[in-house]
C-alpha cells in the first residue's frame, strides 16, 4: 500500500438560525463513522459485476501467525477490483474517508471539525455538502505540509 501525504482539514459550520435541521444533520454526519460515505455513498462494488459480468471474490490475506492483515476483492482472472479507488478519487477527491479526527466541537449554532485526508482536501465532499446543505455556512481550510500547499476551498 502506498502511503499518502496527509492533508489537514479544518471545517467550520454555522447555522443562521433558520437552517437548524440541515445544520444538525450535517453535524451528525460529520461526527459519525465514515462521514464521507454517509454524505456521498460509494457504490457497493462487491455486488456490482464488472464489464464481463463477473463479480469480485473476497480474498483474506493472513500473516504467518494467522492474523488477518488485509482483505481484497479480485475477479476470476486475478485482477484486483480497484473500482472503489477510482470512484473515491473521482467523486470525493481523495482515496479514503476522513482519518484522525482531531477536533469535533459542536455548540449552539456553530461547529468545528478537524481531520486528515489523503493527498488533498476532499473537493467532491465539499461540493456535495454545499449542494445538499445549501443553507449551512461553511469555511474549509486545508494544509498539506508535505507538498507545501494550503488554502480555503471556495464558497
Please give the residue ranges for each predicted region.
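Long, contiguous binding/interaction regions
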Residues: 3-155
